[in-house]
Amino acid sequence: MTDVGLMSYYLGLEVKQMEDGIFISQESYTKEILKKFNMLDCNSVNTPMESGTKLSKFDEGEKVDPIFFKSLVGSLRYLTYTRPDILFAFGVVSHFVEAPTSTRLKVTRRILCYLKGTIDFGLFYSSSSDFNLVGFCDSDYAGDIDDRKSKTGFVFFLGDSVISWSSKKRPILTLSTCEAEYVAATSCTREDPVYHNRSKHIDTRYRFIKECITKKEVELKYVKSHDQAADIFIKPLKFEDFQRLRSRIGMKKKNQN
């Protein structure tokens, strides 16, 4: 066995070892994507999706090459491993991968324009971080204008370092904002990719969360909207809010102190 020193590259992930922590990014891969889709010279934008954007199956627009669109969306998927800031936007456009139109392509290309201006961004893991596990979860209500299903987002931190994140449309309808929040809280509490979403009764979710609290497995706390880190995973935000939450989830420039 040969000692080749500290890891600097692994499966497309660039790892920068620093005195105060580790910085992980995909700068080279991002440049490859921009070059592949002729976006190296595009004008950059401040957010991956414009605030208020909603896509629908009834959107107008000319049909575009489905192979090109699938390739573009597929290329973005791998980036979400180190770029949680594009996860929500990626989730929205990937929902329409089988029905690409010029309207949807425009929204997808905006993600590339955002990446152009943030090529050197990545995740920073501080060496001085504690080991307290903290999770944030949130949900919109009936946010999908086609089927009125809700979007759930959560993010987990170990100390100040983000370790897990998710942005998913729930496969069931929720009948109130309260129920949508219970679904989000249950999903976050379990943080389980095989969570059985077909258990529809709200009482089941309530009792599950209550049992976890009683056993002191979790501590549930109210979080003000301004401090809700999971908001970046459930809706397109204005730049000021997006920038603040992007920083909150540990994203920074490579040489930023």
Where are these regions (language model features)?
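Conserved pre-motif C helix in the palm subdomain of viral-like polymerases
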Residues: 69-85, 140, 178-190
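Residues immediately flanking
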Residues: 13, 26-27, 127, 139, ...
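RNase H-like nuclease module associated with reverse transcription
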Residues: 9, 132, 150, 168-257
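C-terminal reverse transcriptase regions that engage the nucleic-acid substrate
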Residues: 3-121, 224
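RNase H-like nuclease fold core
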Residues: 76, 136-177
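Structured nucleic-acid-interacting core domains from mobile-element enzymes and related host factors
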Residues: 114-137
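Amphipathic alpha-helical interaction motifs in eukaryotic regulatory proteins
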Residues: 31-35, 56, 73, 77, ...
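Beta-strand-rich binding-surface signature
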Residues: 10, 21, 52, 85, ...
